[in-house]
Amino acid sequence: TFVATFLLIIPNVAFANVVKSFRVWPSPDETRVVIDLGSEADYSYFSLSGPDRLVVDMKDTTMQAKLPVTVSDSPVLKLVRKSSPPEKGTYRLVFELKKNVQAELFKLSPTPGGQYGHRLVIDLPHGKKTATTAAKPSKPATTSKDMSTVQRAQEVLIVIDPGHGGEDPGSIGPSRRKYEKDAVLSISRKLAAQLDATPGIKTRMTRTGDYFVNLNRRVAFARENDAHLLISVHADAFTSPQPRGGSVFVLNTRRANTEIARWVENHEKQSELLGGSGNAFVTNTKDRNVNQTLLDLQFSHSQKEGYKLATEILGEMGRVAHLHNTKPINTSLAVLRSPQIPSVLVETGFISNPTEEKLLFQRAHQDKLAQAISKAVVKYLKDNPPEGTVFSPSSKPMVHIVKRGESLSVIANKYGTNSKALMAENKLKSTSLAVGQ
């Protein structure tokens, strides 16, 4: 009997990686494309013109996601499609652009909580920074001897920062369907509306939709807008479902002093990675000692004021919600590190707690939280008025010209005062007003 053994050699066609999905997040400043992968990306890229395109070659990769992807709400990106690869085993992606842009590509590792695996991120800047236009203070009105000596002092500008967004969901509740980014955006919108309705206050939001904003960009946004305060809104989380209640974090350059504070700090670093590279601020190396002294003074002031604001917020939040900490917590989160601007990070509750997860998405509870924070901010401003603002006693009087349909009580309400005070200030003998007075 003759036995023959044959070895069948089959070429290895298994791919090392797979594209699972595409996610596109247009924001006011840039369009972010996130490619979800099975493993770490091995890629190269280049740009083409006539028409403008970005070409990305991914080695040993196959496609599981559906292509093409049409993008309708981005000012720079039209379409993502496949193209003929330069060699076998490489998958070529073509990003059809509306104009020439300088793309930034970087890889992200899986998130600790397992929400996302390996990713390749492509940032396509829009060019003009539409979301970061500085808020210009109102020009003083012409001095007048008319009725309302009510030249306008500067309004207090408050930047509200809804945490996370877009590619970064923040913490995810035990139901696995509720994201921190959505709850805090809703609360932030309500807070902005509450504060904007207060005479002498106006707000700006670091994001107004579901898109990611780099942590350093959030701080820069507050600086560019000459903000008097920065309030970052988040929902807390922990590895067990038991912790519950709100907290307020304030700046401290020392290491976080509780286990939960350390967890939040480490969790935020994952969000910081989503923005690629960059430093919070760079000092002038030629005047290092002077800069250090100035920074120390600025940090000392912003830290002290931030602590005052945090204390007020905790006092009001405690009336409408359970508190996890009744005193401000010291930490060194990036969003709190602006030396010029008193900043606080408000944890509105634990999304990892099943009961609080439900509360954080209830409109009535969101309203209560927004009202509590707003009330605390107004109280802080009255007790600690920023110089040159309408809250400051030393502010120059404002001029108001009476318009048709306005009564003394309407004007008084607009400026947060009462009719009697306006009559005394303007030496009025009657509540009757004339248009143009």
Question: Where in the sequence are the language-model features?
Answer:
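Bacterial N-terminal signal peptides
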Residues: 2-11
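Extracellular LysM carbohydrate-binding repeats and other cell-envelope/extracellular binding modules
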Residues: 395-401, 413, 418-437
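Catalytic-core regions of hydrolytic enzymes
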Residues: 134-284, 299-311, 367, 420-423
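Structured segments of extracytoplasmic/periplasmic soluble domains
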Residues: 38, 83, 98, 123, ...
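Buried hydrophobic packing residues in well-ordered domains
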Residues: 35, 56, 95, 122, ...
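Signal-peptide-cleaved, periplasmic/extracellular N-terminal interaction regions immediately downstream
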Residues: 15-158, 179, 401, 407-413, ...
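Active-site-adjacent mobile loop/cap segments within catalytic or ligand-binding domains
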Residues: 43, 56, 178, 285-390, ...
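Flexible glycine-/small-residue-rich
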Residues: 37-39, 58-60, 97-99, 123-126, ...
